[in-house]
Amino acid sequence: MKLAVYGKGGIGKSTTSCNISVALAKRGKKVLQIGCDPKHDSTFTLTGFLIPTIIDTLQEKDYHYEDVWPEDVIYKGYGGVDCVEAGGPPAGAGCGGYVVGETVKLLKELNAFDEYDVILFDVLGDVVCGGFAAPLNYADYCMIVTDNGFDALFAANRIAASVREKARTHPLRLAGLIGNRTSKRDLIEKYVEAVPMPVLEVLPLIEDIRVSRVKGKTLFEMAESDPSLNYVCDYYLSIADQILARPEGVVPNDAPDRELFSLLSDFYLNPGKPQVPNPEEELDLMIV
């Protein structure tokens, strides 16, 4: 099974991805997490350090793929999760999406692509150009990380459009939204009313989730010394269980940008505004 995790930049995709990877490993699966971000920090929470990237390794080997061994690019992380960082070109030069393709090509040459029960792609921000949408070519499911805010849901809608486009030619489905660090879910619910899709989980607004990223530890590792965090781990285990059940998923019908902008902005501009009754509904009630 192959998963692709997307979402607005800074929303907590990598923290979420790492914890889902550990949750899948705790369910007995062999997991590989591939970081698809030039910052190459996707797997930091699993390994505790910035591992060398595939591009760094290929450059050292003068792009002789036959000279690269699995141990050169695959690093063991917490919970037995294997970790790879694609890396990227120098800032302002080259195409990061091309690097993702080279990463998959190398892993296939190493016969590593088919050795895992689950491969999870953690993908750069909300960039949905052809290059960074490449992981959707391989994925069975896409998961979108969001919060209860306007910008994150607007980005989620654009990603949903990419899923719909890729699903035309690939067996790809949207598994659902994951709400990260949010005290409310009312705007999320308003969005999924307009664009029907599952909500896998909504994680609570607790500081430990953010702190785990700084510490370079997953919530599961932190819970070993602080059992009060076990309840947070249960959210990730729930997501893992839902994914392993191979849900039907959806091919989303994204909302037009202007329509969504009006829908979400109206939620803020007119909070608690009573719904205008439908004249036909009023007539029906009178007849009854």
UniProtKB/Swiss-Prot annotation:
Family annotation (Pfam families): Fer4_NifH
GO molecular function: 4 iron, 4 sulfur cluster binding; ATP binding; metal ion binding; oxidoreductase activity, acting on iron-sulfur proteins as donors; oxidoreductase activity, acting on the CH-CH group of donors, iron-sulfur protein as acceptor
Entry binding sites for Mg(2+): S14
Catalyses which reaction(s): chlorophyllide a + oxidized 2[4Fe-4S]-[ferredoxin] + 2 ADP + 2 phosphate = protochlorophyllide a + reduced 2[4Fe-4S]-[ferredoxin] + 2 ATP + 2 H2O
Gene3D superfamilies xref list: P-loop containing nucleotide triphosphate hydrolases
EC number: 1.3.7.7
Cofactor remark: Binds 1 [4Fe-4S] cluster per dimer.
Pathways per UniProt: Porphyrin-containing compound metabolism; chlorophyll biosynthesis (light-independent)
Cofactor(s) needed: [4Fe-4S] cluster
Binding annotation for ATP: G10, I11, G12, K13, S14, T15, K39, N180, R181
Cytoplasm found in the keyword field: no
Positions annotated to bind [4Fe-4S] cluster: C95, C129
BP terms from Gene Ontology: light-independent chlorophyll biosynthetic process; photosynthesis, dark reaction
Keywords, in A-Z order: 4Fe-4S, ATP-binding, Chlorophyll biosynthesis, Iron, Iron-sulfur, Magnesium, Metal-binding, Nucleotide-binding, Oxidoreductase, Photosynthesis
Alphabetized InterPro entries for the sequence: NifH/chlL_CS, NifH/frxC, P-loop_NTPase, Protochlorophyllide_ATP-bd
Matching PANTHER family: LIGHT-INDEPENDENT PROTOCHLOROPHYLLIDE REDUCTASE IRON-SULFUR ATP-BINDING PROTEIN
Record family assignment: Belongs to the NifH/BchL/ChlL family.
HAMAP family according to UniProt: ChlL_BchL
Quaternary structure annotation from Swiss-Prot or TrEMBL: Homodimer. Protochlorophyllide reductase is composed of three subunits; ChlL, ChlN and ChlB.
Function of the molecule: Component of the dark-operative protochlorophyllide reductase (DPOR) that uses Mg-ATP and reduced ferredoxin to reduce ring D of protochlorophyllide (Pchlide) to form chlorophyllide a (Chlide). This reaction is light-independent. The L component serves as a unique electron donor to the NB-component of the complex, and binds Mg-ATP.
Protein name according to UniProt: Light-independent protochlorophyllide reductase iron-sulfur ATP-binding protein
Lineage: Bacteria, Bacillati, Cyanobacteriota, Cyanophyceae, Nostocales
Gene: chlL
